Amino acid sequence: MFSRDDLVTTLTTSLIQGTPAPSSQSSIHRRFGSFQQATEPVNHGYRPSRVSASEKSIMFSLGGNVGSTGKGILIGILSALGSAGIAIIVLSLVFFLRYTHRGRIILDRLGRPGEYDDEQAFAREEAEALESMDELQQAEYMRAKAFIQANPPESAQTDISLSQFLAIQEKGVSAWEFEPELEIANCFVEARTEIEFFDSECSVQSNLPVPKQNEVYYWEAKIYDKPETSLISIGMTTKPYPLFRLPGFHKTSISYQSTGHRRHNQPFTPTLYGPEFVQGDVVGVGYRPRSGTIFFTRNGKKLEDVAHGLKSQNFFPTVGANGPCTVHVNFGQLGFVFIEANVKKWGLAPMTGSLAPPPPYGSEQGSILLETGRENSQTPQWWGSAHSRTRSGTIRLGQGGPVRSPTDISLAPLPHISPPHDVGEGTSNSAQAGENDSDVDAAILDQPPPEYSSPATSPPNGQSGDARIDIHPDPNDPPIPSYDAAVLQQQQQV
């Protein structure tokens, strides 16, 4: 029989030395078989004593071997699943990019929404819309389509130039005004921002685009007069744009219509957006250049954003209508109805310019440069004595009339003097008339002009009485300062 110590020693040795050979295993079974038979009836009443340290080490060794094997199996399974998942993802992307290209609507290269990438889908929608249009609408649409093909959006240079920037610095928000298209001539602009539309479809753009320096820019349009049959469209467009169409109907344009719909590059189907606006309402348009977001307001209440990501375009405020109406636009020259825009000063530019305008006429007394030019301009001009008296056979200087100074240019009416009797050809008075003419010419040569006396000498450099102006500057005089230096000196004196 084996004692407990022999059993522990044998198990420890087998674990350390590894798995024994088949012959060794059979001998072990024979040795332990008798032990199990001998101890079998005794185990019914046996209570195990406290586990020793060596037994704990054996149990830990057995658990560690089992855990390492499980971890290895788990790692292998996860690796296989990960590789399979990556392969499935790659195959899905290849299938999606290769076999579904024609059925997708993709944003353009800058991620801007509303651009039609699927030409077939757009052509299908266009064909369905043209069937429901009348002949006039079809003609207008085809005309606009031809205009856009000949003048693609953003094909013109619309950045603010240096001269426009200086005009904004000088005039402030007053630099913005609406310029109607002369070829259309279906609207009239008064006082720069008051637009009156007539009986056909027409749009009008501002002369300058919305700047991009500040965080938000905002402007408002008040509906002063609007019949129920007229449709008004207020929004933003780029140049060139077909102004015989309303904003929002074609690419790179967006608008809020009086029917409560919005249009964003959509000539066919409008989208319901907000409440309708009628006479007396105020519609505002806001633009965030940093995020390219456009939003609208109605009577001071902000509506949801319409578009995002429109950063690269230069947008022009645009108002259009298809019937008689009157719209007044506020670019910031007055207070806004939208309180947030009023407080944060979201106008297109300051109300007053920061650059002083040119000085008015007659205010050059304090300018050294202009005063010097005035002095030089007072130099009298002299002519030769040969030109002081002229004679022409067609001028009758000896005839009667009021005596005037050569410098008198008054427009007072002259007294009526009966002219001498005309002497016609083939009359008996022809010879007498010739003699009278010779006598008059002789008298003219003997008499000097009235109130005229030639000066004793004609100075070469010009002289007026006792005053004499030297046109040659004195080398001892200080140099004439430049314009900038003169302006700076004048400001310091003030």
From Swiss-Prot:
Residues 426-435, 454-464 have a biased composition (Polar residues). Gene3D superfamilies: 2.60.120.920. Residues 98-494 are lumenal. GO terms for biological process: protein transport. It holds the Pfam family SPRY. The chain crosses the membrane at residues 77-97. The keyword Glycosyltransferase does not apply. This is Protein SSH4. It comes from Coccidioides immitis (strain RS) (Valley fever fungus). The gene is SSH4.
